[in-house]
Amino acid sequence: WTRLHLNWLRKLELSKVQRETVEEYLATYEALTSKIAALDVRIEDIASEERYSEKVNKLKCIKGIKTHIALSFVCEIGDFNRFKSADKFSGFIGLVPGECSSGNTERMLGITKAGNRHLRRLVVEISNTYRRGAVGRKSVALRERQKDMPKDVVAYADKATNRCQRKYQRMMFKGKNSNQAVAAVARELCCFIWGMMTGNYSRTAQAEASVYRSELD
């Protein structure tokens, strides 16, 4: 609710009982809002600790990932290198397609949803943000999060954002429903999160630089 809407509620002409009820709801709303704000401050404090800050700041360079989501991934996973590949990590989250095999017949199913439910919910929440906005356009908030971050980190994050946005648009153009498109984007995003946390962004930048130099030679 906006402050304008809250003021409108307070100025409504109501009976005494209705006014008491509305005021009780508003008091509860204000109390919970204050509590959430205090928790957000505490989360920011924890995320700024040395053991978390580098990883959290890298993930925050990706569209849709703010502090509480980045910290959730860092704390839940710990060492991302325990997953040998992006596919293994996606499988842990529960975003790989299932398979039903019988004899010589193989049939691919929807995503398994067998994995970390909390992180899967978060990555789907992020993926829903890619339904909106033009490819390549950054919000003021995202630019601020990317400020002073290494260029290769920002470039990799932008690549992730653009790929995910294009994937959603492409699947919708092909006639897929929104849930299918978001699930596909979520899997793609998981791969980029794994890449960011395992240093793949650095290897990608080095490989691209090597190709560029060979073309000049």
Regions found by a protein language model. Give the residues of each.
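Basic, amphipathic alpha-helical segments enriched in Lys/Arg and hydrophobic/aromatic residues
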Residues: R166-D217
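HhH-family (HhH-GPD) DNA N-glycosylase catalytic core used in base-excision repair
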Residues: W1-R10, N81, T105, D158, ...
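Glycine-rich, often acidic, oxyanion-interacting loops/wings at catalytic, nucleic-acid
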Residues: W1-K58, Q146-D148
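Short helix-capping/linker segments at secondary-structure and domain boundaries
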Residues: I36-L39, G78-R82, T129-K138, C190-A205
